[in-house]
Regions:
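Bacterial signal peptide processing site
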Residues: 22-25
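C-terminal motif of bacterial Sec signal peptides marking the signal peptidase cleavage site
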Residues: 18-20
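Short coil/linker segments at helix-helix boundaries
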Residues: 31-63, 67-68, 81-196, 206-239, ...
């Protein structure tokens, strides 16, 4: 009887283990499906609807990560989600507050944007560490960063891109923090490696990000900036509007080229809906382009 009881215990434990495996498999499948379907938001043209979906999505992705902390798809969704939401919606709130001369509200949204980018970086670095350990040590200088990133391949391009974009964007909203500015090279290296692996990733977003980076000041590498922007526009046949908007906002602004600045932004505003896969990103570009054609924004460029 003792032998039979022992066998029943083994069978019971095996059944419990099997149920746990089934639940994990189902959860992982749901997360994978969510990642595959998450691109549907890009086809929306309604900014407010997209904003609601994006914030709700973050809650869903956080819950998935809580249930499956080692799931790479969940980590990717959180990295991309926090980065994209901060840029598309939180920074939009910040710009509106700035234009309204509401310093308190502007500072509130700037802090929100920084926190969102910090969260994106946290999840992104966690995902990178699952591929290759040693990120914190590698970020000390450009050479060690490039050596670390040599361990990543083409299928890592999107992850590198989203982490890098979050890093660069955080530096932009925290310009008054020397510690953040001192690590700007980390974001550049991440995006550069992504572009090396797949320059078409996310509709050449890496090229546009590098273009903006190299036009960060009037004393920066403006010739290199223009090359990156022109390549991004070439790769997307001019149909992805964010590279064009960013070209005007950064490069033409820093060059003091008012004619090209206005011409490019008006091209963005007047562009037809020819890229449904990037309808939301193009709607965001149009929204920002209209804002940057305002007198106050143009005055910031010295126009």
């Amino acid at each position: 009887m003792r032998h039979v009881g022992g066998r029943w215990w083994i069978v019971a434990m095996a059944a419990i283990f099997a149920v746990g495996c089934i639940k994990t498999t189902i959860l992982n499948g749901q997360i994978k499906g969510t990642r595959e379907g998450s691109v549907a938001i890009d086809t929306l043209s309604d900014f407010e609807v997209a904003r609601t979906i994006a914030y709700a999505g973050l809650g869903q992705f956080e819950g998935m990560h809580e249930l499956a902390p080692d799931n790479e798809d969940a980590l990717f969704l959180l990295t991309k989600g926090w980065t994209a939401t901060a840029f598309a919606f939180i920074e939009d709130d910040y710009e509106m507050a700035v234009d309204a001369d509401d310093e308190a509200r502007a500072e509130y949204h700037r802090a929100r944007a920084r926190a969102a980018y910090d969260r994106a970086i946290h999840y992104g670095v966690t995902l990178l560490e699952m591929r290759a350990k040693g990120f914190d040590k590698a970020k000390n200088n450009i050479a060690s960063m490039k050596l670390y990133l040599s361990q990543f391949y083409r299928n890592d391009a999107l992850t590198l891109l989203w982490v890098g974009q979050a890093w660069l964007a955080k530096s932009n909203v925290a310009k008054d923090d020397p510690a953040v500015v001192a690590e700007l090279h980390v974001g550049e290296a991440l995006v550069e490696r992504s572009v090396e692996l797949d320059e078409n990733a996310a509709y050449a977003a890496g090229r546009a990000a590098l273009g903006a980076y190299h036009a960060r000041t009037a004393m920066a590498e403006l010739d290199m900036s223009l090359k990156h922007f022109m390549r991004a526009i070439e790769l997307t046949r001019g149909n992805a509007l964010l590279p064009k908007f960013t070209l005007a906002r950064t490069y033409y602004c820093m060059k003091g080229d008012k004619a090209s600045y206005e011409k490019t932004l008006r091209e963005v505003v007047d562009a037809a809906d020819v890229l449904p896969e990037q309808r939301l990103q193009n709607a965001i570009a149009k929204r920002r382009a209209r804002r940057y054609l305002s007198k106050s924004r143009m005055a910031n460029c010295g126009f």
